[in-house]
């Protein structure tokens, strides 16, 4: 089980085990990607999974390091915001 496999699903469909798991896994790194009106936050979790949150819709979905690399090569500005997401 990974965080990226759980996010984006209806909360009411999550099992108790999935809820507990998603709350127990910590964020290791977080980055804001922006270009024009596009703005996303990517979080990398300690289980190796990656999620992407759209700043406009607040939708969070599973993602990948490859998607992050593609957006970087597409000219997105990247800001390290790890301190805002870790405790």
Task: Tell me what each language-model feature is.
Residues 2-22:
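Negatively charged, low-complexity tracts enriched in Asp/Glu with abundant Ser/Thr
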Residues 16-87:
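Acidic, low-complexity, intrinsically disordered interaction modules
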């Amino acid at each position: 089980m990974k965080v990226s496999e759980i996010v984006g699903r209806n909360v009411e469909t999550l099992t108790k085990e999935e809820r507990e798991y998603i709350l127990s896994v910590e964020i290791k790194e977080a980055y804001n990607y922006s270009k024009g009106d596009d703005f996303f936050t990517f979080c990398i979790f300690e289980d190796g999974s990656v999620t992407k949150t759209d700043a406009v819709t607040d939708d969070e979905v599973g993602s990948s390091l490859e998607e992050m690399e593609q957006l970087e090569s597409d000219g997105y500005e990247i800001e390290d915001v790890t301190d805002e997401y870790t405790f």
